[in-house]
């Protein structure tokens, strides 16, 4: 989330006249991320303050966005801790701001933990499984837009910027994933709406108090979501939450906690167990490709902070080398 499109307090106040959320008290740009323009918004209504997030979409179109926004609404209505879109006085949850499609959603409580514990990994695994099950009856459909068709499109554009072993891996792994995605086993894997970007900075935790243990504040930033294999969503999450950041190697204890918590809610199938390593490779490749693309073919942004692509190159190399890697769970289901 970066600030590509600046918005003034006066501009946001005029836009908010279409909502029943009160008057503007503060508007602050969110510098992290690389896709959309985001602001924390504080309003006052009836003597109380309220916190929201306003998002202007820089790449996604008004035709694509209903999938994401109504998915968030659907999940929130099914008890999943996610931001809820706020409808305007006319009932619409999407309207233009500064020439871009925009929305306002509730701000979740808590903070991110970039050094997660095994307990937090288990909490995330449990809620991710519940999110997948809650999305089964979501009626809208849109594929993950950063999957194989996109890799096929952008990898040729990236190749001139990389050389040697890096270029060899980029090309060889694309060929491996083309074979995997084209297999009957891949086609049979269970699927549904997925977050597709559930990194540590997209999850909030409310800290423990004297009266309650630490608990999940929620999942947010659903704007890479799409219908995909559930195992891909798990692999994306494990590749960020359960790794040694210096080497890209998996942390067995954190991974075990996440996978077993997920499996207790939505048991993995035999086919998912067989293709765990393939999917970890796919998840690593997806983010390596997108980071290479953003790094070498950047867009202008007022507060853009591009991610280092070499991290996911290390992660991918580790997954390619890990030939004996399996799902560390009780017996999967058929």
Swiss-Prot record:
Biological process per Gene Ontology, one example term: threonine biosynthetic process
Record field: catalytic activity: L-homoserine + ATP = O-phospho-L-homoserine + ADP + H(+)
Functional pathway: Amino-acid biosynthesis; L-threonine biosynthesis; L-threonine from L-aspartate: step 4/5
Gene3D superfamilies the UniProt entry points to: 3.90.1200.10, Phosphorylase Kinase, domain 1 (3.30.200.20)
Protein EC: 2.7.1.39
Pfam families for the chain: APH (PF01636)
The entry's keywords: Amino-acid biosynthesis, ATP-binding, Kinase, Nucleotide-binding, Threonine biosynthesis, Transferase
A molecular function GO annotation: ATP binding
Classification via InterPro entries: Aminoglycoside_PTrfase, Homoserine_kinase_II, Kinase-like_dom_sf, Pseudomonas-type_ThrB
Organism superkingdom: Bacteria
Keyword Kinase: yes
Statement: the UniProt record of this protein carries the keyword Protein biosynthesis: no
Family: Belongs to the pseudomonas-type ThrB family.
PANTHER family, per the entry: AMINOGLYCOSIDE PHOSPHOTRANSFERASE DOMAIN-CONTAINING PROTEIN (PTHR21064:SF6), AMINOGLYCOSIDE PHOSPHOTRANSFERASE DOMAIN-CONTAINING PROTEIN-RELATED (PTHR21064)
Name of the molecule in the record: Homoserine kinase
